[in-house]
Amino acid sequence: MNQKAVQKINYAYLLLTIFVPLVLIGVMGYIGATFFREGGTGAVICFMLPTALAVVWWIFGPTTIWRLRKKAMEQQLDQQGFTRNQTFYGSNHTVIVDIRKGMIALLFFWNPFVSFILPASRVTKAWTDDGAAGSGFLRGTSRVSFLFLIDGIKIRVDTFTSNQRWKMNDEHVLTGISKADMWVQVLAEAKEASELRDGTH
């Protein structure tokens, strides 16, 4: 069990992910300009290869790490006897709940090397945000989420997102709201089970 406060972002990891490729481009560019002033294959390698590798890293690196770390966390949970009753794979969060034991496991995209396995009693509030905006026939949403507070930190997990506004009675929106409501209920049940185990309920 992780007793540390939840941390959604590891800023060292975030900065390394962004800036290490830039440093590589700068260093190799300097080498190319210094030692291959007349061009040629060496200059092409120094200028083009690091840029290509950086782009590939930015596109695939963090997402590959994220995917591998999710699998590693699931294996860790299984080894610990954590029953994965409900799992939600968000773009930036993974939330897994063992309802009977009242436990929650969290993994964050920008802090992928630390999995937080916590008693659900640390959740102080959980709710659905349908993202509704506008009025009349313009009323709609482009984002539906369930949110919860744990250790005073707000965690938002999207169940529906779009780059345009959808009407509130649209099937996709209603499905997103239904998923969010279900997760609020799951968190409430896990919290109750956790408090019963702790003798605080």
Outline where the language-model segments fall.
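Anionic N-terminal interaction surfaces
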Residues: 2-7, 39-103
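Juxtamembrane interface helix immediately N-terminal to a transmembrane segment
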Residues: 2-23
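Hydrophobic alpha-helical transmembrane segments of multipass integral membrane proteins
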Residues: 21-28, 51-55
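Juxtamembrane "helix-exit" motif on the non-cytosolic side of transmembrane helices
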Residues: 27-38
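Short secondary-structure junctions
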Residues: 78-87, 125-128, 132, 198
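Glycine-centered tight beta-turn/hairpin loop motif at sheet-sheet or coil-to-beta transitions
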Residues: 92, 111-113, 150-154
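Phosphoinositide-binding peripheral membrane targeting modules
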Residues: 100-141
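Acidic, Ser/Thr- and proline-rich intrinsically disordered linker/docking segments
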Residues: 127-201
